[in-house]
C-alpha cells in the first residue's frame, strides 16, 4: 500500500514537538542559529516554517561539515544541519515511522521507536546463550552513509510513499550539499551522517537491500539455526555452521 497524501500531517504542533525533541546544546548549522536562539519567537518562526513547507517555498540549507576522530585514528565526517532543517526532518521522520514500523523486521534495532542498543545487545546475548549457534559474523557496511545511492534511496522510499511533496523534501535534503571552510560542495552519493533524517533513510535502504534478503537466505539456504541482529549498518549474524556465514559475507 502506498500513501499518497501525507504532508497534511506535518502540522505546527508536530513541528513544535519536533523542535523540543532536538538536543538543546547541539552545534549550530551553517546559519549559525542555535536551539536557544530559535526558541525566541518560536511560534512565529514555526508558523512561517509551516507555511514555507506547505507552499513549496522551503529550501534546505547545506550541512556544515565537521570531523570526529574514530577509534582507529581516522576522521569520520559528520553533517550538522540547521535547526529549521532538523525540525522539518524530525517531523517527516515521525510521519514515516508510522508507515515503516509496520514493515521493518524484528532483528532491526537501530534508530527505531522503543528500541535501543541495549535491546540489540540483549538479543545478541540471548542468542549466544540460548540458541544453537557456534559462529558469529560481525559485519559493518563500509562507508555506508557516505556511499548510499541517492536514486535508490528515493526508489525505496517510493515503495510506500507516493506523496510528491514528501519525496521532494527528501530529495532536497539529499541534494543540499555540504559547507566546509566556507565552500559549498555537492554530495553525489550518500546522506549526511549526523542528520536527523539519515537514520530513517538508512533503515529503509537496508530493509530492502539487507533485511529482506537475509530473511529469504535464512529460510531457504541456511542449514541449522541462524539468528541476525542489525543495528543501523552493523549486523551480527550467528549460525551453527561456519560455511553458511561465509556465504553471507558476500552481501557485505
Predicted regions and their residues:
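Surface-exposed loop/turn segments and immediately adjacent short secondary-structure elements
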Residues: 1-55
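Conserved polymerase palm-domain catalytic core
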Residues: 45-48, 52-66, 71, 103-115, ...
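Duplex nucleic acid-engaging cores and interfaces of nucleic-acid transaction enzymes
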Residues: 84, 88-93, 135
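Electropositive, glycine- and tryptophan-enriched low-complexity nucleic-acid-binding patches
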Residues: 90, 94-109
Amino acid at each position: 500500500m502506498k500513501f499518497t497524501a501525507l504532508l497534511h500531517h506535518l502540522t505546527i504542533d508536530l513541528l513544535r514537538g519536533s523542535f523540543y525533541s532536538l538536543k538543546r546544546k547541539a552545534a549550530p548549522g551553517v546559519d549559525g542559529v542555535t536551539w536557544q536562539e530559535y526558541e525566541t519567537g518560536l511560534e512565529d518562526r514555526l508558523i512561517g516554517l509551516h507555511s514555507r513547507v506547505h507552499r513549496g517555498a522551503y529550501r534546505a540549507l547545506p550541512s556544515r561539515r565537521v570531523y570526529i576522530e574514530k577509534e582507529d585514528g581516522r576522521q569520520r565526517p559528520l553533517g550538522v544541519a540547521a535547526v529549521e532543517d532538523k525540525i522539518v526532518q524530525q517531523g517527516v521522520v515521525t510521519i514515516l515511522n508510522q508507515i515503516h514500523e509496520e514493515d521493518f523486521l524484528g532483528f532491526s534495532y537501530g534508530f527505531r521507536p522503543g528500541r535501543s542498543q541495549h535491546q540489540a545487545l540483549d538479543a545478541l546475548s540471548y542468542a549466544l546463550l540460548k540458541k544453537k549457534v557456534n559462529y558469529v559474523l560481525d559485519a559493518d557496511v563500509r562507508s555506508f552513509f557516505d556511499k548510499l545511492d541517492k536514486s535508490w534511496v528515493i526508489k525505496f522510499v517510493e515503495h510506500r510513499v507516493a506523496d510528491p511533496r514528501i519525496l521532494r523534501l527528501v530529495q532536497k535534503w539529499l541534494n543540499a550539499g555540504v559547507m566546509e571552510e566556507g565552500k559549498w560542495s555537492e554530495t553525489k552519493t550518500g546522506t549526511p551522517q549526523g542528520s536527523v533524517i539519515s537514520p530513517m533513510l538508512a533503515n529503509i535502504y537496508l530493509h530492502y537491500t539487507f533485511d529482506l534478503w537475509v530473511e529469504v537466505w535464512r529460510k531457504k539456504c541456511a542449514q541449522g539455526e541462524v539468528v541476525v541482529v542489525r543495528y543501523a549498518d552493523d549486523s551480527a549474524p550467528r549460525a551453527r555452521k561456519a560455511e553458511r556465514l561465509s556465504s553471507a559475507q558476500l552481501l557485505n
